[in-house]
Amino acid sequence: SEVTAEQYQEFYQHLSGDHQEPLAWEHTAVDVPIQFYAVVYIPRQSPMELLFAPEPKVSINLHVKRVFIQDDCNDLLPLYLRFVRGVVDCDDLPLNVARESLQNNPVIAKIRQTLTRRILNKIEEMSNNEPEKYLTFWESFGIVLKEGVARDVENQEKVSQLLRFHSSFSAKLAVDAATDAAVSDAAATDAAATDAAVSDDAATEVDASADADASADADADTSAESKPSRTTQTEGLVSLQDYIDRAKSDQEVIYYVSGENRQQVEQSPLMEAFRKRDLEVLYLTDPVDEWVVNSLQKFDSKEFVAIDAEDLELPEEVKLEGVDEPIEDRERTIELVSYLKTELADRVGEVKESNRLTDSPCALVVPRGGVSQQMERLMRMSDESFPMTKRTLELNPKHPAIANMGEILKADRDSAELKDWAHFLVDYVLLAEGKVEEPQRVMSQVQRMMSMASEAALKARSA
């Protein structure tokens, strides 16, 4: 007889000890080329040990001809699917199979390959047809699933299609989704009010109409379920395919920015040029995100490019008018760049003009061959001797602060105020990134600059 949903859920609770309903399950029966049966579940919530266990393990129990052989059999699934719970029963293994021999057993390898493919298909089905449920899955297990991009070359493309990120378009997507939901709710309320106002004399007609509407709604629901929903609109999360579909016609790369949190990357000065040009940027805020895109390298033949790369090139057709125009006083900027290279030699690797900044005075970018701050932090967690990258300081020559520094330099190259401003350019960017080197020095510097600014304001008022 057919197994009911209640029976599947009861078995899951017995197997896992989890009293919540699972998000999904897959019942597999395979006869060729080997014979095995499996029931696997995707839980609703992540257990604590999933990320913090000293030795990660796969929670799949192995049976042979219905005889228990081993629990937590790591050979049955790749570790990035360790959130899956389940049981496998195989008829093509001997009852006396040794645990030590499972790793290189061709039967086990085939089971692993088949199960992995079916689980990924189940997750993909959820992402296409049940975006709300997929959001729950992603919040619980997304950080673990990402490991598959680097660790499972065979299924890398499949896993990459399941990745989700926030992006510079996320806020708009979330607003659009909320607006659609509000419109839908309002329409439903209006429809209910209209139905309530219909006279009893027309009840039969209303009932017939309601039946027809219900049938149409059911057809529409079926159609909606069969049509893949590529974006988890609820929280503005986007897939890589979403990004590709929205990209400019001549855009050949996927832009991303990495940082500790969404607020930090949104406030990055480097985002200015992309907002002006209406170019979408992925936000990589999980510690493993940059490792993931470096492993993936490309999606749909488009390379991943960090927006803090020094040699970044933007599409020609969307360059802003006036951004690359020569400034009025080239000599002033050249002199300032030369001065800053000397004054900040211990803090930055290079100083140059920027052709991407529009509102901010400066930004720090990663030189060719260097690693981002997020990746550097990750590397230094495992190796404290990992060398720190000296980033390049880019100046916006049209910003008043930079122009004024150039004028101060022309008047007095040895000005103490100019030296303070020079170092504050670097500190300004670090503050925006949530990192402060030598807080006491920065506090003293800010106090001096406050005094200078107030004195200048008084002089201007009395003049």
Regions from the language model: what does each represent?
Residues 1-463:
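Conserved GHKL (Bergerat-fold) ATPase module
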